[in-house]
UniProtKB/Swiss-Prot annotation:
Pfam families: HGTP_anticodon, tRNA-synt_2b. It catalyses: tRNA(Gly) + glycine + ATP = glycyl-tRNA(Gly) + AMP + diphosphate. It is an enzyme of class 6 (ligase). Catalyzes the attachment of glycine to tRNA(Gly). The gene is glyQS. Substrate binds at R102, E165, F212, E213, Q214, M215, E216, E324, P325, A326, A327, G328. ATP binds at residues 197-199, 207-212, 284-285, 328-331. The modification N6-acetyllysine is found at K394. GO terms for biological process: diadenosine tetraphosphate biosynthetic process; glycyl-tRNA aminoacylation; tRNA aminoacylation for protein translation. Its main location: cytoplasm. This is Glycine--tRNA ligase.
């Protein structure tokens, strides 16, 4: 098996666009910078990632429940959380090209390339577009929250924000969940949803966009146990990616330096994936933060509502600390695609070998679980194959393809990660059996048509 090293990220981006995983948003109008739509295969992969996260983090545990909070929250929420005052990035403009950049990103890229920070700051950084010695404006603070106005007139009273994270919708519902779900620490609240950030320099395909989806969970604990729980969730979340097929050597843990921690954090560790970006190949998949009691304390102070917890057994009242694993759905999407991409060889009908592109996605993530392929468009084969496809579709997402040579159809399915191909051939008319081909090893089993669903159920467990 050959995992191409060269610009695999570019190859995967092209594959994603060509096969309908991802489309540029509004493409017929020229597109929107760094905005993407998810096509038929992309939306299935996204849903499967979400399903696996939800099972692992929420429904697979007895100490976590789910929530779905509003995208537009009261403005006071963002004042209390600190986002109105501190959710800023340093913006600089090149005096050569007049393009704008995040100053910290320019400095980080320099450090990644040279192994040390620029001795003279921005003055040492060349213009990314032209390569000339850089000429930069003074950095200024740029608030990344997207504004909107509610009501018929754009007034200060109507000013609201599209949420830059899903977490705050969880914190403001802490007391509701404690009461209605009868939960007490240690317990968590999970949420998957859209967030919005007015990024200065979006890019790297779907890695950094202004509209994105998060998979976040806030885990509320006694303060004395916070460090232990923090390490637990770092280990748990790292293992989740490995269990779903990402190779360990392509993952690393990155500890935020104390001087770069967010205003709420005592310690943050990022799970990073080796995407292969220019400059620094590593990119954040997920941050796991010890947010201390900052969130519940600030919302209690600003709202006047008591958000502490009373421990009846020990007769003590405390404000819980929060451990937050916060994952980017579309970043996970990108990592799973890149890590699954392989090239190998498969035998052709002429006795030779052809190059084969395969997405070795875990079957639980694969957009299509099986493809039903009649050997030809024969009047007796197609109806039988369509009936089988309809039966299997009751359980899984199934493709039906009767166009072209069978070898070419296998390749089409391999390229999008379909784990199984079910071929209805002329022998099927006599023995009521089909050939089931497995994607990775290309092994084939003859299976009775009445047993195909059971055969797949064993091999698609957890899908």
């Amino acid at each position: 098996m050959h995992h191409p090293v060269a610009p695999v990220i570019d190859t995967v981006v092209n594959l994603a666009k060509r096969r309908g995983f991802v489309y540029p948003s509004g493409e017929i109008y020229g597109g929107t910078k760094s905005a993407w739509d998810y096509g038929p295969l992309g939306v299935e992969l996204k849903e499967n990632i979400k399903r696996q996260w939800w099972r692992s983090v929420v429904t697979g545990r007895d100490d976590v429940v789910g929530i779905d909070s509003s995208i537009i929250l009261p403005r006071e929420v963002w004042v209390a959380s600190g986002h109105v005052d501190v959710f800023h990035d340093p913006l600089v403009e090149s005096l050569i090209t007049h393009k704008r950049y995040r100053a910290d990103h320019l400095i980080e890229a320099y450090e990644a390339k040279h192994g040390h920070p620029p001795p003279n700051g921005l003055a040492d950084i060349r213009d990314p577009e032209t390569g000339e010695p850089g000429q930069w404006t003074q950095p200024r603070e740029f608030n990344m929250m997207l504004k909107t106005y509610l009501g018929p007139i754009e007034t200060e009273e109507g000013l609201h924000y599209l949420r830059p994270e899903t977490a705050q919708g969880i914190f403001v519902n802490f007391a509701n969940v404690v009461t209605t779900a009868r939960k007490k620490p240690p317990f968590g609240i999970g949420q998957i949803g859209k967030s919005f950030r007015n990024e200065i320099t979006p890019g790297n395909f779907i890695f950094r966009t202004r509209e994105f989806e998060q998979m976040e969970m806030e885990f509320f604990v006694e303060p004395a146990t916070a460090k232990e729980w923090h390490q637990y969730w770092i280990d748990n979340r790292l293992q989740w990616y490995i269990d779903l097929g990402i190779r360990r050597e392509n993952l690393r843990l990155w500890e935020h330096p104390k001087d770069k921690l967010s205003h709420y954090s005592d310690r943050t560790v990022d799970i990073e994936y080796k995407f292969g970006f220019m400059g620094n190949p590593w990119g954040e998949l997920e941050g796991v933060a010890n947010r201390t009691d900052f969130d519940l304390s600030t919302h209690a102070r600003h709202s006047g509502v008591d958000l502490s917890f009373y421990d009846q057994i020990n007769d003590v009242r405390y404000t819980p600390y929060v451990i937050e694993p916060a994952a980017g759905l579309t970043r996970s999407f990108m990592a799973f695609l890149i890590d699954a991409y392989t090239e190998d060889e498969a035998p052709n009908t002429k006795g030779g070998m052809d190059k084969r592109t395969v997405l070795r996605l875990d079957p639980r993530l694969a957009p299509v679980k099986a493809a039903v392929l009649p050997l030809s468009r024969h009047a007796d084969l197609s109806p039988k194959a369509r009936d089988l496809g309809a039966e299997l579709r009751k359980c899984w997402n199934i493709d039906f393809d009767d166009a072209g040579a069978i070898g070419r159809r296998y390749r089409r399915q391999d390229e999008v990660g379909t784990p199984f191909c079910v071929t209805v051939d002329f022998d099927s008319l006599q023995d009521n059996a089909v050939t089931v081909r497995e994607r990775d090893a290309m092994t084939q089993d003859r299976v009775a048509m009445s047993s195909v669903a059971d055969y797949l159920a064993v091999r698609l467990k957890g899908s």
